[in-house]
Amino acid sequence: MDIKYKEIEAKLFELIDMLKTCFTQAELDEVIEFIEYNEYSLALDTVIDIIIEEDKRINNDILNIMIKLSSIMNLDSGNLNKKMIAYIL
């Protein structure tokens, strides 16, 4: 496994651990399933969708990991920040 993918997977599991305070186990399991199938972008997209659709509140540490992940995966971290800013505690 490429070092970049190991870093992404480690960050995703770090994110999962932090989300235990605001996500249900079923929501976490859905994200974990994508990670297990190496669908890292879908895992992050699912986290974003759950936060928005379920009106979840997240802290800055969670947002920072999400931004770091999007940056590592060459996604638009600026757009992510704009989407998530309304959900910060």
Predicted segments, located by residue:
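C-terminal-biased regions
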Residues: 1-89
